[in-house]
Amino acid sequence: MQTEPVAPMLEMRCISKRFPGVMANDSVDFTVLPGTVHSLLGENGAGKSTLMKILYGLCRQDSGSIHFEGKEVDISSPSKAISHGIGMIHQHFMLVPTLTVAENVALGLGGRYGISDMRPIKKRLSEVSERYGLKVNHDALIWQLAVGERQRAEILKALYRDVKLLILDEPTAVLTRNEVDDLFVTLRQLTADGKGLILISHKLHEVIALSDEITVLRDGKVSGHTRPKETTRDQLAQLMVGRPVSFTREVASEIGRASCRERV
């Protein structure tokens, strides 16, 4: 018996974006299904960050369209993205250090409760924390938290807003091994609940371990699309750099260095 095909949660169709002297995205197609992790790979300057900035409303595409849950959407700002159910966890966390976790969540809620009454916010935060295993003290000031706890606070802030699609930019870059394991448990729970995840990472072993789909960008274009069971780290590295490689310590180091440079 054949199963019905799953309708995409997100379709970015023929997205192009030019900056002075560089074509950051050149007719890029990118699709995310509900309940899946779709990883986006590429070297420094490949166009990953630009594509995700377009999706999150941080810049506008020159051409192409974005379709979310079957409808074409115009995403002109991060608040627009959030209103559609699209959230983003940045590599450098976007939290106010002198406010508590709960107060950071309350920022930008449009005065539904206001910071003067945190009880409804804390109640729901506790529910979301328990559901996804995101343990963090909601009354702690952000500056008092460890890096892994700050990331959990960022994820809680997005989930509080009922996001359906979450972009994670290099989420394991500053985490310990145990924190990475905990994060992966949370991400799998999110996909089990039907949420779509976009993972930007240069750690190929993590991409293969966590992803359902993998898209590779090179020089602003899609150089390949595959699934973990159909590929290897060597093949992914070749799609990234455009030449045959053997995944040695040298190649891993080169890819790691690229992720730390300024990205387009």
Segments (PLM) and residue ranges:
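Glycine-rich phosphate-binding loops of nucleotide-dependent enzymes
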Residues: 2-263
